[in-house]
Amino acid sequence: MSSGLDLELSFSQSLQGLGLSPQMAHLIWLPLPMLLVLTAAMVGVLVTVWLERKISAAVQQRIGPEYAGALGVLQPMADGLKLLVKEDVIPVRADGLLFTLGPVLVLVPVILSWLIVPFGQNLLISNVGIGIFLWISLSSIQPIGLLMSGYASNNKYSLLGGLRAAAQSISYEIPLALAVLAVVMMSNSLSTVDIVAQQNGAGLLSWNVWRQPVGFLIFWICALAECERLPFDLPEAEEELVAGYQTEYAGMKFALFYLGSYINLVLSSLLVAVLYLGGWGFPIPVEWLAGWLGQSVDAPLVQVITGSVGIVMTVLKAYLLVFLAILLRWTTPRVRIDQLLDLGWKFLLPIALGNLLITAALKLAFPVAFGG
């Protein structure tokens, strides 16, 4: 069962201890989950954009951002401020309503998906029992926003970019879902908290990446394609489509696409860490750590250390994958659209289906090792 802390219950009890009624405590709590999610997402984007600019500069033997803060750490904030004050332009022949709704439909599902990510053993906003199903459902909304943006712009490059984005997203959504289903089958749960808890038995050796190496690779490749990262950035290929479905956008509407892309990258990396790399789990069993400290596993000192370091472990694993994604972007060439679709439908889909069937067979044959 869930080992995460019910933040709503703890927050409500704290406010009730100050003399507030349960109803008032609940009303105060209502906006806080989204505020926490937005804060975490924005911080993740700022760090990722800074890393992207510095790593790309290192790959190309440049210095990169240097003047906006120490080592250019404030450059992402300067970029965001610039986009914020730019004029919001809607093309004359564009469909204004759809043109405005498109970026919103791209960004909102990605932000909502953060609600199901456990950042640590005692840091979980919403332990939804069907968290994985909710995430897959939300991610299926994004192609609608991309296609809507391309169509509403009344621009041939935008339309082609939107069509490419929708085709790419649909093509890679299916193998990604099949890869996740194999993990769900082993964990006997759709809850992200339960999936992490199932991997914390023997430290590093109990991580799902060892039992699902093929699923791990399929998920990571599909996640890069869903985030439209090189070598899969066909929808916005500058040499072919100017900027794809983003061509006619400026100011904050363009910034919403920018935010959605980077928030999705950080989210995908966090989900890889949760599903395959043990989430907040230590590389060593917690019992060993408690033994070295001369404490029991349930001792307050051990609980504080494991809770604090668990958050760091989750973020560290995620940003290791973010670093890999950034490095791939600046060191690999773009694939053609036919190669991209062939990879999704003719290669990854059959392998993901085979991996799911093999996992089911192994679960029946070796129930202890595969979560029977």
Swiss-Prot record:
Enzyme class: translocase
Pfam families: NADHdh
Reaction(s) this enzyme catalyzes, per UniProt: a plastoquinone + NADH + (n+1) H(+)(in) = a plastoquinol + NAD(+) + n H(+)(out); a plastoquinone + NADPH + (n+1) H(+)(in) = a plastoquinol + NADP(+) + n H(+)(out)
E.C. numbers: 7.1.1.-
Reported function: NDH-1 shuttles electrons from an unknown electron donor, via FMN and iron-sulfur (Fe-S) centers, to quinones in the respiratory and/or the photosynthetic chain. The immediate electron acceptor for the enzyme in this species is believed to be plastoquinone. Couples the redox reaction to proton translocation, and thus conserves the redox energy in a proton gradient.
Similarity annotation: Belongs to the complex I subunit 1 family.
HAMAP family found in the cross-reference section: NDH1_NuoH (MF_01350)
Oligomeric and partner information: NDH-1 is composed of at least 11 different subunits.
Name of the featured protein: NAD(P)H-quinone oxidoreductase subunit 1
Organism: Prochlorococcus marinus (strain MIT 9303)
